[in-house]
Regions:
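Short, well-structured alpha-helical segments in soluble
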Residues: 112-124
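Catalytic or ion-coupling anion/metal-binding cores of large enzyme and transporter domains
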Residues: 2-63, 67-69, 74-95, 100, ...
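A short, small-residue-rich loop immediately preceding and capping a beta-strand
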Residues: 122-142, 153-158
Length: 397
């Protein structure tokens, strides 16, 4: 599903002198002379970068963010793919938004990361970008900033952590801590059990493996068309995740050379499909806030009325916690988002482009579903209408 050789939107290829970075490195002037000298200072030979697409690898890795602790290695895989495709990767550290540790809330800093992303891409000599993130607000922040600059861009989602385990229970990191904390308050479990739960709740790098905000927004990014197919559900520590990162590096170079920019991908139709997918997944209500903000950066008007209208046309087909029974690893091996979207084709805009294919239709062609208990048939939905209801009135200001 993540084969970098698949075609994508756009025709023709730009000449090296048409690249944005050429203005920094390729002209016969004092500034380019200085920039080339400083690139030598970085340890690069001219033949390693001159005339090649410069790809910014924006990495939200940090020691303090457990959702992203593996992204240091994934950035290396992305850079490997860029080198292999004939590009010149440069890694940029950007702010990390840790839902667990950042107080009073990372929401205060979403727009700060969006601004940082925008200004880094705008001010440096880069032709395209690969964005690495996944913990809740990181996904919208990175895509908001990138949308404002409108370069060729691929998003590499951090991926869900492994399922939690405690005795005979499978734990969902984003939900079961509340459940068992209430049980402790009620006196039904004690300190010994709580210590065991601490060991079993979060077992690996990656974001929460329930269909909470993180999984909802990375799924939205995939259906928007800015990730490789199937990328959003690959477990963070699965070797397939590293392969996806490398394939994303390969892919971005092709997108740069064909000048497939984010504005060609993030269309009104793409945002409608993202809303439909979030609703059919039974995803987080936080997606309402973030998708509206992302659409605004893309010049697309998206409102609560759109969520209400689309919710009446899509059933809930994903049996995922917290509203269902299963976790993201189950969803991935049941078919992931490609298989899931294959059951929503009647409400999707199938002729729009993605970073991987000329059309979403082509991207979904033949995508299987392996477990209809996890990804339900349309004839057997969890609910007849989407998972978000819009209320209005004096109790809903």
């Amino acid at each position: 599903m993540t084969d970098a050789s698949t075609r994508g939107p756009g025709t023709g290829r730009v000449a090296p002198e048409e690249l944005r970075s050429h203005r920094w490195f390729g002209t016969d002037g004092l500034r380019s002379f200085s920039h080339r000298a400083r690139t030598r200072q970085l340890g690069y030979l001219p033949e390693e970068h001159l005339g090649k697409p410069v790809v910014a690898v924006l990495n939200t890795w940090s020691d303090i963010n457990p959702c992203h602790t593996h992204l240091r290695d994934r950035a290396q895989a992305v850079k490997r793919g860029v080198w292999q495709a004939g590009g010149f990767p440069l890694e940029f550290p950007v702010s990390t938004l840790s839902e667990t540790f950042q107080k009073p809330t990372p929401m205060l800093y979403r727009n700060l990361l969006a601004m940082e992303t925008e200004e880094l891409l705008r001010s440096y000599p880069v032709d395209g970008a690969v964005l690495l993130g996944g913990c809740d607000k990181s996904t919208p922040a990175l895509l908001m900033g990138a949308a404002s600059v409108d370069l060729p861009t691929v998003f590499v989602p951090a991926g869900p952590m492994l399922p939690g385990h405690w005795r005979n229970e499978v734990l969902g990191s984003g939900t079961d801590m509340w459940k068992y904390w209430d049980e402790r308050r009620a006196g039904t479990i004690g300190d010994c059990e709580m210590a065991e739960l601490e060991n079993g709740l979060a077992r690996s790098p990656g974001h929460c493996m329930t269909m909470g905000t993180a999984s909802t927004l990375t799924a939205a990014a995939e259906v928007l068309g800015v990730t490789l197919p199937g990328a959003s559900s690959i477990p963070a520590v699965d070797s397939g995740h590293e392969r996806m990162a490398a394939a994303s590096g390969l892919r971005i170079v092709d997108l740069v050379m064909r000048q497939v920019t984010l504005s060609q991908i993030l269309t009104p139709e793409a945002y409608e499909d993202a809303v439909a997918t979030v609703l059919a997944l039974g995803g987080s209500t936080n997606a309402v806030i973030h998708l509206i903000a992302m659409a605004g950066r893309s010049g697309v008007k998206l409102t609560l009325d759109d969520f209400d209208r689309i919710a009446r046309t899509v059933p809930v087909l994903a049996d995922l916690r917290p509203g269902g029974r299963y976790l993201m690893e189950d969803f991935h091996f049941a078919g992931g988002l490609p298989g899931f979207l294959g059951r929503l084709t009647n409400v999707l805009h199938l002729d729009r482009p993605t970073v991987a294919h000329d059309t979403l239709r082509e991207q979904l062609d033949g995508a299987p579903v392996h477990n209809s208990a996890v990804i339900r048939e349309r004839s057997d939905p969890l609910a007849g209408e989407g998972g978000v209801a819009v209320l209005r009135g004096n109790l809903c200001p």
